[in-house]
Amino acid sequence: MKKHPVRIIALAVSFIALALTTAAVRTSRSDTAAKKPIITVYKDPSCGCCKGWIEHLIKHGYRVDVKDTPEMTEIKHTLGVPSGLTACHTGIVNGYLIEGHVPAADIDRLLAQKPKIAGLAVPGMPMGSPGMEGGTPQRYQVLTFDKSGKTTVFASH
């Protein structure tokens, strides 16, 4: 008869510990997402790899405001994306342009360092970049660019 109260107490303690752990993990994830800014992403409504890149951003704690539009060429021109750096989608975060399949870790670094540039770009659609998984991965570079279109290498993957 004494075994039952002990089991009930042990079970209750285990349940409380599990509940507290789950709450701590949720709070940690919420805190991470709350600290990262919203990225506005312009993309064509039918673009599948854009959806993959957006999922990558969300997985890494970003909140994303998606703007589906068939007018991507006009948007890139209006925002000032240099023509030689274009890809399939364009993002804006904290005043920086993010062109193409830029990894979330590079966006994190950009936002931490706050360089005086217009943005980051991964020209084209290299296999193996976020949103372009599958197939044989290619080496690619993340480039910085300024308003005149001058580029430098920010990261190599």
Predicted features, each with a name:
Residues T78, G84-H157:
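Thiol/selenol-based redox catalytic cores and closely related redox-interacting motifs
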Residues T22, I39-D44, L57, T73-L79, ...:
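Short, functional N-terminal and low-complexity linear motifs
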Residues M1-K2, K35, Q113:
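Generic cytosolic/nucleocytoplasmic N-terminal low-complexity/intrinsically disordered segments
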Residues M1-S30:
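N-terminal targeting signals for export/organelle localization
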Residues S46, W53, D68-E71, P103-I107:
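Stable alpha-helical elements in mature extracytoplasmic
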Residues A34-I54, H60:
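Local sequence-structure signature of Cys/Sec-based thiol-disulfide redox active-site neighborhoods
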